[in-house]
From Swiss-Prot:
Native species: Rubella virus (strain RN-UK86) (RUBV)
Listed Pro residues bias regions: 93-107
Ranges of Basic residues composition bias in the record: 59-69
Miscellaneous remark of the record: Structural polyprotein: Translated from a subgenomic RNA synthesized during togaviruses replication.
Extracellular side: 301-534, 583-1028, 1050-1063
Cytoplasmic topological segments: 556-582
Gene Ontology CC annotations of this record: host cell Golgi membrane; host cell mitochondrion; membrane; T=4 icosahedral viral capsid; viral envelope; viral nucleocapsid; virion membrane
Binding site for Ca(2+): 670-671, 718-719
Name used for this protein in its record: Structural polyprotein
GO molecular function: metal ion binding; RNA binding
InterPro entries the UniProt entry points to: Rubella_Capsid, Rubella_Capsid_sf, Rubella_E1, Rubella_E1_1, Rubella_E1_2, Rubella_E1_3, Rubella_E2
Keyword vocabulary terms for this entry: Calcium, Capsid protein, Clathrin-mediated endocytosis of virus by host, Disulfide bond, Fusion of virus membrane with host endosomal membrane, Fusion of virus membrane with host membrane, Glycoprotein, Host cytoplasm, Host Golgi apparatus, Host membrane, Host mitochondrion, Host-virus interaction, Lipoprotein, Membrane, Metal-binding, Palmitate, Phosphoprotein, RNA-binding, T=4 icosahedral capsid protein, Transmembrane, Transmembrane helix, Viral attachment to host cell, Viral envelope protein, Viral penetration into host cytoplasm, Virion, Virus endocytosis by host, Virus entry into host cell
Length: 1063
């Protein structure tokens, strides 16, 4: 088997040198046969020193003329033969010790950083001419030995779908002077074609850059720069390429198109031969103008048809009831303030200020007046939300001379013009008999107006509901649209799904005997088609869709047909959830388990759960103050626990007796003497005589057994009564305290929303149900807790300490800071002192209080039989050892740490308007208070039945919906009593306490003139928006367009971030 010789680096070097010699010979032959002779050129003195010492056989660095101080650009073309020979002759021969002189290398690529890289394998195309054309490169037209002032670096772009949004840039020298001269063999100098001025891209990028493409997706241009966009595949990967294209030459000859293109785009001018086909600003401005015209034309189609009735004419005859009073006009009127009207009104037989009688909305200026009169005679129609005022007035002609006027409200004298009205006292004595009743008050010019007023008298008309008005609820231009009822008149009969419409009702479509009302574009188109192709609704739909179509077109071109819809979705719509709620309500819920409230759906607090991470802190036994004793009618010979076993329990006595160091014992003989006081036989004076001790002593005296009978006041031994008591601090076997530390605490509130269970916490305070979303204002979690589980003789309870204990501070002696044992056998704290035993008589006033700390009270109780007695023992707290005892725990802990101070706030948003069942039973205990036909709502209160909302009606007039239970509402009543109330089914009679319209008659004088009656107006934001709806609509359209353009810019910047930091 023949052996193979491995290829070494020396063999590769020889092969590269041979290839380099062949290529250099070809380049030299092509340069000598050029059609245009190259004149000899003197070497620049600035570079002669640098070239003189350079090895001619080594690779030549080609440097651009950008920022390096060179006037000649060697990267444009190789030097002429004469200059090459001169360079070789001036180059010293290499030293013998070095390698043989190297032959010319293949062309190298200038990196722009003073270095060069070998030319990579370009792959297809195989011809340098095809490679240059594929790059969009055009060598210069002029002589390469001269300067090229227009030479610059241009940038082309490539990106691959397989690499995401990673962009690659390729920088090349480019000129706008047209095509260069060809060699005699019809070829360009390859050195002129491969002339990069930036870092060499990766090999796969260069291969994709030189890959011929079969079509052109688009041509883009701005000013003198023109690019062609192509899509192609290299090895199964789809690439996008944006190549810089040449422009028309200065001599009029157009550069040839790339041979692989299939689409020719005609040039339109010598200055801008390659023109972008779309994107002129005129098209965008024309689109905005078209949108403005469409919106203006479709004004009637954007809003539903509403009953916008004009002000009615004065009633014929006047719609007033009762009598009027016109005999008290001599009184001066009350001057109002803050622009309100003033006047003294007569209600019944009493005089009252106008501000106390007229409705509140009249005082606030929420009414409009229509002045149809001159200064001699006129008719005034004042319309409010609930009533109309009518008035016909006659004025006297003004006097010839001005008259000063001074009032109590303003002491300054107001100068009147030459044609001033009559003095204030003139005309006030006129009778109201010639006036129409139903005259309404006038509005002041300002509060300090001192001019004469006009005579006002009459009654208000019957209350009227405002006309029905609708509005369309637009949701960011997204369907569906809804119809919103602003005001509703019951007699119009508008219903939504069979339910009467009320102010605030949202419904896709309303139905009434008059027809249908809707805001839906689809319904509008259908109605437009049905109504002989009316243009109103069609234009409304066009205005709705036009901004989005325009945004899509602009984005599609701005992003070069990539990602316009994705950018709009990601930037504009992805982070926004359009509201789809039908109703929203807010209420409170108490924090006790079982509490319930009524939002659009019932919500009940099922329970409260506590979650935490638990760390066991051990267990300890608290000191227990324990006492025992006996009342005996004889003196036993053995006073130990065994000897007193017949009277004292053995187990506790032994437990106390064993703690002698902390035990307290006394023995009282003849506890009850003839005087009935307690005495201790063991206490003696120094002289040996006895005395009565009316109060008990501390346990400092040993038991009295063994003394003589003389110490017992002479009673026989068999009649002596003795008391034995024993007390001590001990460890009780059934009293323990276990400690647990809780961290990362969290309170879980268990709610029931219309039968659906859900849990809310501070981290997730929302509850999503089929009925809608419930947001709960959850109180903050308590934080770290310490739990004390106290087990006292079977009665176990837990106490909670807020926060971690400060064992290096004031809590150092607390039970939680002591060393505990797992089996609860360790007593916590130091050994306490002895307790105090007190022998207390049964009638001692001390027994009305509680034993003090560390005290035990013993009271003998004489039995009902001879030689029978008992003992009553009361033990107090734990004395000085309270720090170690459960009393400290009770003082520093709570039983419920997660109970918030206030109720929970509930905000409920329904998915759609909730249709709860309607109650049909009549309401009970309904009372009506107020007046009827007076323009002021009457108060209706009662108890609504269960089973759903009650749609309350009074004498057939709809009042509104009320929830089950007690309700209080206001209603305008147009009928006199009696009143029949119902919820849609059976009716019941309500008790009424109302006054008739005659009691609402009024007369008076109000300041102000005709011309200034409505000079002072107030406007709410809603009224301002209604008056400027056209500007708001146009602004919304412009905002949508701006949002779309910003979305496109964001998307394009995301894809073109390679221009800032390319690979």
């Amino acid at each position: 088997m023949a052996s193979t010789t491995p290829i070494t680096m020396e063999d590769l070097q020889k092969a590269l040198e041979a290839q380099s010699r062949a290529l250099r010979a070809e380049l030299a032959a092509g340069a000598s046969q050029s059609r245009r002779p190259r004149p000899p050129r003197q070497r620049d003195s600035s570079t002669s020193g640098d070239d003189s010492g350079r090895d001619s056989g080594g690779p030549r660095r080609r440097r651009g003329n950008r920022g390096r101080g060179q006037r000649k650009d060697w990267s444009m073309a190789p030097p002429p033969p004469e200059e090459r020979q001169e360079s070789r002759s001036q180059t010293p021969a290499p030293k013998p010790s070095r390698a043989p002189p190297q032959q010319p290398q293949p062309p190298r690529m200038q990196t722009g950083r003073g270095g060069s890289a070998p030319r990579p394998e370009l792959g297809p195309p195989t011809n340098p001419f095809q490679a240059a054309v594929a790059r969009g490169l055009r060598p210069p037209l002029h002589d390469p030995d001269t300067e090229a002032p227009t030479e610059a670096c241009v940038t082309s772009w490539l990106w691959s779908e397989g690499e995401g949004a990673v962009f690659y840039r390729v920088d090349l020298h480019f000129t706008n002077l047209g095509t260069p001269p060809l060699d005699e063999d019809g070829r360009w100098d390859p050195a002129l074609m491969y002339n990069p001025c930036g870092p060499e891209p990766p090999a796969h990028v260069v291969r994709a850059y030189n890959q011929p493409a079969g079509d052109v997706r688009g041509v883009w241009g701005k000013g003198e720069r023109t690019y062609t966009e192509q899509d192609f595949r290299v090895g199964g990967t789809r690439w996008h390429r944006l190549l810089r294209m040449p422009v028309r030459g200065l001599d009029g000859d157009s550069a040839p198109l790339p041979p692989h293109t299939t689409e020719r785009i005609e040039t339109r001018s010598a200055r801008h031969p390659w023109r972008i086909r779309f994107g002129a600003p005129q098209a965008f401005l024309a689109g905005l103008l078209l949108a403005a015209v469409a919106v203006g034309t479709a004004r009637a189609g954007l809003q539903p048809r509403a009953d916008m009735a004009a002000p009615p004419a004065p009633p014929q005859p006047p719609c007033a009831h009762g009598q009027h009073y016109g005999h008290h006009h001599h009184q001066l009127p009350f001057l109002g303030h803050d622009g309100h009207h003033g006047g003294t009104l007569r209600v019944g037989q009493h005089h009252r200020n106008a501000s106390d009688v007229l409705p509140g909305h009249c005082l606030q200026g929420g009414w409009g007046c229509y002045n149809l009169s001159d200064w001699h005679q006129g008719t005034h129609v004042c319309h409010t939300k609930h009533m109309d005022f009518w008035c016909v007035e006659h004025d006297r002609p003004p006097p010839a001379t001005p008259t000063p006027l001074t009032t109590a409200a303003n002491s300054t004298t107001a100068a009147t013009p030459a044609t001033a009205p009559a003095p204030c006292h003139a005309g006030l004595n006129d009778s109201c008999g010639g006036f129409l009743s139903g005259c309404g008050p006038m509005r002041l010019r300002h509060g300090a107006d001192t001019r004469c007023g006009r005579l006002i008298c009459g009654l208000s008309t019957t209350a009227q509901y405002p006309p029905t008005r609708f509005a369309c609820a637009m949701r960011w231009g997204l369907p569906p649209w809804e119809l919103v009822v602003l005001t509703a008149r019951p007699e119009d009969g508008w219903t939504c799904r069979g339910v009467p419409a009320h102010p605030g009702t949202r419904c896709p479509e309303l139905v009434s005997p008059m027809g249908r009302a809707t805001c839906s574009p689809a319904s509008a188109l259908w109605l437009a088609t049905a109504n002989a192709l009316s243009l109103d609704h069609a234009l409304a739909a066009f205005v709705l869709l036009f901004p989005w179509v325009l945004i899509f077109m602009v984005c599609r071109r701005a992003c070069r047909r990539r990602g316009a819809a994705a950018a709009l979705t990601a930037v504009v719509l992805q982070g926004y959830n359009p509201p789809a709620y039908g109703e929203e309500a807010f209420t409170y819920l108490c924090t006790a388990p079982g509490c319930a409230t009524q939002t659009p759906v019932p919500v009940r607090l099922a329970g409260v759960r506590f979650e935490s991470k638990i760390v066991d802190g051990g267990c300890f036994a608290p000191w227990d103050l324990e006492a025992t004793g006996a009342c005996i009618c004889e003196i036993p010979t053995d006073v130990s626990c065994e000897g007193l076993g017949a009277w004292v329990p053995t187990a506790p006595c032994a437990r106390i007796w064993n703690g002698t160091q902390r035990a307290c014992t006394f023995w009282a003989v003849n506890a009850y003497s003839s005087g009935g006081y307690a005495q201790l036989a063991s206490y003696f004076n120094p002289g040996g005589s006895y005395y009565k001790q009316y109060h008990p002593t501390a346990c400092e005296v040993e038991p009295a057994f063994g003394h003589s009978d003389a110490a017992c006041w002479g009673f026989p031994t068999d009649t002596v009564m003795s008391v034995f008591a024993l007390a001590s601090y001990v460890q009780h076997p059934h009293k323990t305290v276990r400690v647990k530390f809780h961290t990362e605490t969290r309170t879980v509130w268990q709610l029931s929303v219309a039968g659906v269970s859900c849990n809310v916490t501070t981290e997730h305070p929302f509850c999503n149900t089929p009925h809608g979303q419930l947001e709960v204002q959850v109180p903050p979690d308590p934080g770290d807790l310490v739990e004390y589980i106290m087990n006292y003789t079977g009665n176990q309870q837990s106490r909670w300490g807020l926060g971690s204990p400060n064992c290096h501070g004031p809590d150092w002696a607390s039970p939680v800071c002591q060393r505990h044992s797992p089996d609860c056998s360790r007593l916590v704290g130091a050994t306490p002192e002895r307790p105090r035993l007190r022998l207390v008589d049964a009638d001692d006033p001390l027994l009305r209080t509680a034993p003090g700390p560390g005290e035990v009270w013993v009271t003998p109780v004489i039995g009902s039989q001879a030689r029978k007695c008992g003992l009553h023992i009361r033990a107090g707290p734990y004395g000085h050892a309270t720090v170690e005892m459960p009393e400290w725990i009770h003082a520093h802990t709570t039983s419920d740490p997660w109970h918030p101070p206030g109720p929970l706030g509930l905000k409920f948003k329904t998915v759609r308007p909730v249709a709860l069942p309607r109650a049909l039973a009549p309401p009970r205990n309904v009372r009506v208070t107020g007046c009827y036909q007076c323009g002021t709502p009457a108060l209706v209160e009662g108890l609504a039945p269960g089973g759903g909302n009650c749609h309350l009606t009074v004498n057939g007039e709809d009042v509104g919906a009320v929830p089950p239970g007690k309700f209080v509402t206001a209603a305008l009543l147009n009928t006199p009593p009696p009143y029949q109330v119902s919820c849609g089914g059976e009716s019941d009679r309500a008790s009424a306490r109302v006054i008739d319209p005659a009691a609402q008659s009024f007369t008076g004088v109000v300041y102000g003139t005709h011309t200034t009656a409505v000079s002072e107006t107030r406007q709410t934001w809603a009224e301002w928006a209604a008056a400027h709806w056209w500007q708001l609509t146009l602004g919304a359209v412009c905002a949508l367009l701006l949002a779309g353009l910003l979305a496109c810019c964001a998307k394009c910047l995301y894809y073109l971030r390679g221009a800032i930091a390319p690979r």
